[in-house]
Amino acid sequence: MPIIINLDSVLEKRGMKSYELAEAINITTANLSILKTGKAKAIRFSTLEAICNVLKCQPGDILEYIDED
């Protein structure tokens, strides 16, 4: 998959655990895990906005495009 989710590195920089983020953005830890592992097929803008708001980051800090060519 050419879209990489760098959520773990941003969480580590902020000193926050996954369960804390899940609680703060009101999603289950299971759904956050699916997102973090790249198994999610999509992400709602409202979820991305909530993540960025809590982590004080930009979407580009979390999402990365890798050209597979």
Roles of regions detected by a PLM:
Residues 34, 41, 63-69:
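Short, charged recognition helix plus adjacent turn
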Residues 12, 26, 37, 67:
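Residue-level detection of the helix-turn-helix DNA-binding "recognition helix"
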Residues 16-34:
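Short alpha-helical DNA-recognition segment
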Residues 11, 22, 52:
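The alpha-helix within a helix-turn-helix
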Residues 39-50:
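Short, basic-rich loop-to-helix N-cap that marks the start of a DNA-contacting helix
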Residues 8, 19, 49:
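Residues within the helices of the helix-turn-helix
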Residues 1-16:
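A short, Lys/Arg-rich alpha-helix, primarily the initiator
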